[in-house]
Amino acid sequence: MTSQLRKINNVIEQFLLPLAEAVSGWSTLAAIRSALIVTLPLMFLGSLAELLISFPLDAYKEFMFRQFGPEWRMFGQILKDATFSVMSLIMVFSIGHHLADQFNHDNPVLRANPVIAGLVAFTAFFCLLQQDGDALNRRWLGVAGLFVAILVGVFATRLFLYFFSIKRLHLHLPGGTPDIAIPQAFNAFIPGMLTVLVFAALGAAMQTFVGMSLHEALYQSIRMPFDAIGEGLGRGMLYILSLHVLWFAGIHGANVLDPITHDIYGAAMLANEVAAAAGEPLPHIMTKTFMDTFVFMGG
């Protein structure tokens, strides 16, 4: 037994640890990881809000109703809407900011304003959202849009920094200015415009030629292997494997795969509830409740 454990440790030290170090040292993944970490205070606040409005105890709900009236959930819902419901927006800005910080560390002479980089990525993300009449589809502003937010945050910021590194695209002001933000803004003027124009063209092309937003297209592509496998152990194993591969790369797998969780396992849970209410056999084994109880034990 000891020799087997020693062999396993040798394999981990020789192959897995160098791979993990290489992955953790990749600048893009490091920026994504840091961007997630700095959002933890807001995510913790959103978690408290979710607990406040969804605590599964009737005595608690009755107490809150007596103390604060029928609108007692409003406070928690406002907090949730300001955190979880806009997580993709927070994330895309945070990624842009951290990638610009890395760029400035590697290019101390040619410095880009991290806030401007974050705002450019933020705007690029909006260019890809599908419009519902005069309103935007809010589904992709929250956790469901996190995967696209990560992609847009990386590619939009990388594109902006590429344009920014071309000094001919900088607008130089004559003389000195008392506020350093002014030359930084003018230097980023053309690179920022070009980046947003590229993503606006991509958003328009997706709507015109594909008939759906990039969010929908990527989600359908991610869902295809899950649908192809069919319901059962294979789909569950693929879901868990995908989730932990994302975690291995430093990305919050549960949040990225939230659309799969909601549309497949959440729908299966609702179908079981309908069948149970009708006195029929439950049609699904693997549901969101099954995953939370038997796979993700401990919450």
PLM regions with names:
Residues T2-M43, A49, F65-F68, W72-H252:
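Signature of multi-pass transmembrane helix bundles
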Residues E50-S54:
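Active-site beta-loop-alpha substructure in enzyme catalytic cores
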Residues L257-D258:
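Carboxylate/His-rich catalytic cores and anion/metal-binding grooves
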Residues T261, Y265-G299:
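Helix-loop-helix junctions within the multi-pass membrane cores of secondary transporters/permeases
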